[in-house]
Amino acid sequence: EFQTPEAVMVYSGDGLNGMSQAFHQLYRTRLARGYWRDRERPILINNWEATYMDFDEEKILSIADKARELGIELFVLDDGWFGKRDDDTTSLGDWYPNLHKLPDGITGLAGKIRDMGMKFGLWFEPEMVSRDSCLYRAHPDWMLGSTDRPVCTGRHQYVLDFSKDQVVEYIGDRMEEILGDGGVSYVKWDMNRSISDLFSAGRDARYQGTVYHRQILGVYKLYERLTRDFPHVLFESCASGGARFD
């Protein structure tokens, strides 16, 4: 079974600006949905430019305390909180807290941020995997690309094969473990590279021509699962490398 891509079209007699505004209106009133659609977003601070991946709980709480004084409503912990990630060569896919940096885990840190009167947000890059990761070592066939030739990298990372249900389910399970304690109010969903090497290991030649579309359907499946199970969490897409707006 294969579902072809959907297209969204509008008409305007007022040129490109009118067409752009018609698209905005259509998406905001008919296609966007959920708890956050018409609500004002909280004012947030993100630690990325302040620390990159060089942080521990003490440093994060120090930034959060200053943010609290400024009236910031949401603190977002960016890349580097999971696996053994101290740089961008490792640990994507290993979505469990780095207890060396955060000895009380995400739950403990989130509680301390909330005690300051702010909500807590967290960075994920769900569609990606590092070659130096427990996930890749356990499932090298879960990466997009042929197993008998080199696969292109971007930012030292690879793309997971979201055309496979078991991959989507696994990543969903790991994310739900983190989100399930109720401490995370916001998710920054990143995607820092383009999709290439469109080959799904173990599939026949006919299937390969549908991989790109099935990949995005897999992303949508994960969107649907998480927004259904966590309707009050604000999910924000950040895809400087992926060039998407979904």
Located regions from the model:
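A generic secondary-structure signal for well-formed alpha-helical elements
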Residues: 12, 27-31, 71, 117-120, ...
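Generic detector of well-ordered alpha-helical packing
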Residues: 7, 77-80, 189-191, 237
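Short Pro-Gly-centered flexible turn/kink motifs
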Residues: 1-13
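Pocket-edge structural micro-motifs
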Residues: 7, 47, 181
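Acidic/polar, glycine-enriched structural segments that form the non-catalytic walls/loops
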Residues: 11-39, 53
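Aromatic-lined carbohydrate-binding/catalytic grooves of carbohydrate-active enzymes
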Residues: 36-172, 186
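A generic structural signal for short, non-catalytic loop/turn and secondary-structure boundary residues
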Residues: 2, 36-38, 228
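Active-site neighborhood of glycoside hydrolase catalytic domains
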Residues: 98-105, 111-115, 136-246
